[in-house]
Structure formats: structure tokens, C-alpha cells
Design a protein with these regions (language model features):
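Anionic N-terminal interaction surfaces
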Residues: 1-49
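Phosphoinositide-binding peripheral membrane targeting modules
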Residues: 37-84
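Short, surface-exposed beta-strand/loop "edge" segments at domain boundaries and coil↔beta transitions
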Residues: 28-30, 53-54, 100-106
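Acidic, Ser/Thr- and proline-rich intrinsically disordered linker/docking segments
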Residues: 2-3, 7, 61, 69-139
Length: 139
């Protein structure tokens, strides 16, 4: 079972194992001031072999995905553009299928435009599934 507080604390202290992917960025000063979160630690997303933990700010609960509770994931992409533009805006997320039949949408709240977070999730979940199917514990 994933302990999100322990994962976030270990990553924040710079002690993340090589098998973890850690994403962080400085909190925007203006936005932090306006939301009343300027004293909060910076946003932090940690993807481990067991799941995902994300801290956004003190006003939001820690987001957790425990890979053991999933039955599958599906990559989803939607594109949009304006008629007078050659630029396409991509919206990328994962449909997360839970063992209890629920389906939810996963996209990092703080790193939504950094597609490598979705790639890291897919890689970690795939490795987790491979280890589990071989009867091993991912580490």
C-alpha cells in the first residue's frame, strides 16, 4: 500500500530512490499570494513503482493513485484549434480503471502541460503490472 505522506516527505528531502520520478516547480508568487498558499511548499508529483502521490497546496488534499487498486489505464488525447491558427492545443490524460468498477480521470494538477508526467505514469504502471504478473513485488 502506498503511503503518500511518506513518499512526499522522502522526495522533498531529496532521498528519492532511482526508481522514482519526481517533478517539482516553484510556486508562482502572485498566484500563491492570491490563493493564500504562498507559504506552502512547492508543488510536488512523485511517481513510484507502487503508485502516484501529488501535493498541490494546503487547500487541496494529496492526490493518490495506488497501482494495486487499478485494473487498467487508457491514454486519452483530445486536440483543438482555432480556424485561423496552425497551432493545436492538446489535452492529454489517463482514464484510470479501478478494480471496484469505478473510472476516474488522471492528469497532474500542477504539471498538466508536462506530458512526461503521463509517460512516467504509464511506464511505472506497466512495470508494476509486469512485476505483479511474475509474482514479484515492484521496487
Amino acid at each position: 500500500m502506498l503511503d503518500p505522506q511518506a513518499v512526499l516527505a522522502q522526495a522533498r528531502q531529496g532521498r528519492a530512490p532511482a526508481s522514482w520520478r519526481v517533478f517539482t516547480k516553484a510556486r508562482g508568487r502572485v498566484r500563491g499570494f492570491l490563493r493564500g498558499t504562498s507559504a506552502d511548499p512547492d508543488p510536488l508529483l512523485v511517481i513510484t513503482p507502487d503508485g502516484v502521490a501529488e501535493y498541490v497546496d494546503s487547500k487541496k488534499p494529496v492526490a493518490v493513485v495506488d497501482f494495486d487498486s487499478l485494473s487498467g489505464i487508457s491514454l486519452r488525447v483530445s486536440g483543438s484549434t482555432f480556424s485561423d491558427s496552425i497551432q493545436v492545443r492538446l489535452d492529454v490524460w489517463l482514464d484510470v480503471h479501478h478494480r471496484d468498477g469505478r473510472k476516474s480521470k488522471w492528469r497532474s494538477a500542477s504539471f498538466a502541460d508536462q506530458y512526461q508526467t503521463v509517460q512516467a505514469f504509464i511506464e511505472a504502471y506497466g512495470a508494476h503490472q509486469a512485476f505483479r504478473s511474475a509474482g514479484l513485488h515492484p521496487r
